[in-house]
């Protein structure tokens, strides 16, 4: 006797068990700076230890932080190395961290996805430390200062092209299994976000909220199609805000994807421009359960 289940009820053929490896401030990795050959070996050993623990815990996917805020953890012709590697902005660590991470993940039968922070560029101190290597200096037209931080302007047509230039470096040169986009959204409560000029120029009669949602969706679409044109097998994902919008009974308290940061995640999935979504479910009790039901 065969039992037929509706598609929504069928378990996936392959379960994704993923973990982020965070390089910002060395939260997960690295703890050691590569100021010597011994430093290189120790930094690599720290990453191997994390991967061994993930493998032992039956994880099969690693989201390895590859771009932070206008700086990177791979050899790029566009943005400088993150200072967390050597203690110096743009300092060459003596090896390619992304290539090393991919090789070590594959040795353990795990996928390695390049996790790339997209829109935020960091606070004033961080941007100043990057100096002339900062995108705020090289591509000033697509950058916006807001609340003592800098952001790429999602409403500027060149923003998606700039992001794709970084993605192209990664996908063409590395054997990544996926590309994972973080902070692909406007900052929270961005009513005064400095995009009035681009809105007047490109709004085409849409209200501000819809125009901003369309901007984010267009970046998602452009990056997805760009990756698939290079390597169709590379998976494309994002980590959106975990609450799509307010429910009829519970508000999101000012933090939801659709209204607050202009992510139309259901629209992305309906259009087929995401392979995976990792919603940020940082909630408890009534801050989580009613939204999960919805």
Label for each model-derived stretch:
Residues 26-41, 79-95, 145-164, 204-216, ...:
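The substrate-binding groove and active-site-proximal loops of carbohydrate-active enzymes
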Residues 11-19, 59-70, 94-144, 180-182, ...:
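Glycine-rich, aromatic-flanked loop segments that form ligand/cofactor-binding clefts
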Residues 14-16, 22-45, 103, 113-114, ...:
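Active-site-adjacent "subsite" loops/lids of carbohydrate-active enzymes
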Residues 72-87, 120-146, 183-204, 249-256:
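Aromatic- and acidic-residue-enriched segments that line the glycan-binding/catalytic groove
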Residues 57-93:
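Aromatic-lined carbohydrate-binding/catalytic grooves of carbohydrate-active enzymes
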Residues 36-57, 84-108, 214-225:
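Aromatic- and glycine-enriched glycan-recognition loops and surfaces
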Residues 42-71, 173-178, 267-277:
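Catalytic domains of carbohydrate-active enzymes, especially glycoside hydrolases
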């Amino acid at each position: 006797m065969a039992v037929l289940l509706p598609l929504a009820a069928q378990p996936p053929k392959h379960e994704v068990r993923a973990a982020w490896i965070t390089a910002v401030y060395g939260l997960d990795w690295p703890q050691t700076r590569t100021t010597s050959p011994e430093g290189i070996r120790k930094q690599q050993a720290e990453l191997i230890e994390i991967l061994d623990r993930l493998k032992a815990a039956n994880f099969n996917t690693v989201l390895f932080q590859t771009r932070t805020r206008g700086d990177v953890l791979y050899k790029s012709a566009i943005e400088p190395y993150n200072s967390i590697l050597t203690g110096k902005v743009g300092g060459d660590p003596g090896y390619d961290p992304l290539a090393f991470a991919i090789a070590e993940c594959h040795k353990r039968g795990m996928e390695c996805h390049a996790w790339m922070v997209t829109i935020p560029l960091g606070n004033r101190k961080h941007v100043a430390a990057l100096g002339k290597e900062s995108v705020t200096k090289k591509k000033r037209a697509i950058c916006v200062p807001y609340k003592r931080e800098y952001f790429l302007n999602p409403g500027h047509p060149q923003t998606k092209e700039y992001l794709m230039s970084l993605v192209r470096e990664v996908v063409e040169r590395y054997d990544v299994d996926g590309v994972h986009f973080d902070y692909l959204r406007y900052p929270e409560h961005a009513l005064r976000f400095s995009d009035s000029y681009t809105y007047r120029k490109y709004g085409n009669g849409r209200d501000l909220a819809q125009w901003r949602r369309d901007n984010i969706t267009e970046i998602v679409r452009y990056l997805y199609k760009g990756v698939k044109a290079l390597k169709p097998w590379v998976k494309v994902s994002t980590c959106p805000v975990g609450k799509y919008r307010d429910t009829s009974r519970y508000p999101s308290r000012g933090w939801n994807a659709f209204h607050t940061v202009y992510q139309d995640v259901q629209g992305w999935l309906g259009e087929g421009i995401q392979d995976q979504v990792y919603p940020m479910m940082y909630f408890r009790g009534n801050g989580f359960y009613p939204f999960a039901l919805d």
